[in-house]
Amino acid sequence: MNHGKKTFLLALASAVVLSGCSGSGQQMTAYDAQYLDYFDTVTSITIYAKNEAEFEQYKSLAEDTMKKYHELFDIYDNYDGVSNIKTINDNAGIAPVTVDPELISLLEFSRQEYEKTGGRVNVAMGSVLSIWHEYREAGLKDPSRAQIPDMQKLQQAAQHTDLEQVQIDPQASTVYLPDQEMSLDVGAIAKGYATKRLAETLEEAGVTSALLSLGGNVETIGTKADGKPWRV
């Protein structure tokens, strides 16, 4: 989700030597794929399949799923036909935004995490995090001028981080930020949520054995084809 930068895909798929039999006795082979263009991190998937053709079907589904969540949760870029986190932020103080039900689900989950962590996980911290991002990028561009943000500036931004103000309407599938200075940043939970949903999607499609890692957020499906547990 790098602002102003093109994303690129590195998909490396190969059958590894390890293989095994499923519970039905079907010979299964582990296939791998790695990507660099989702969530600004390394994504790797290992899926046991009967053959390469079956793996390609699962891989295509995984790519479509990761692309969907990458675009929905992006705070920097717009995508044709997609109302994402950036769309919500751009309409702060203007109007509710109709979004994909998955965004409603993510934001409702974020409220649960907010309560569970006593407010330490707060997706409404976008106004503060954007300042840190701005200073970090400036420091990377010119290390000799790197500095931390002014405390007063951060404190002012912190006045616009009340998660309770975020208006979520599940029935209408809309999200609205009434405070025009507020913005959402779901980076703290997006990758974990997307990894979990990816696992659920692949399992529903018939995958019985897989290891999925999205930036270190790991989910497994079943065991290895030989019955041994995945080592994470």
Protein language model features and the residues they cover:
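Short, surface-exposed beta-strand-loop junctions and turns on beta-sheet-rich folds
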Residues: 51, 183, 192, 226-227
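A contiguous, well-ordered beta/alpha segment that forms the leading edge of an enzyme domain
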Residues: 3-184, 200-203, 208-209
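N-terminal low-complexity, intrinsically disordered patches enriched in charged
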Residues: 49, 197, 224-225
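Cysteine-centered nucleophilic/redox motifs
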Residues: 179, 188-214, 219-220
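Hydrophobic/aromatic-rich core segments of domains that either
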Residues: 216, 220-232
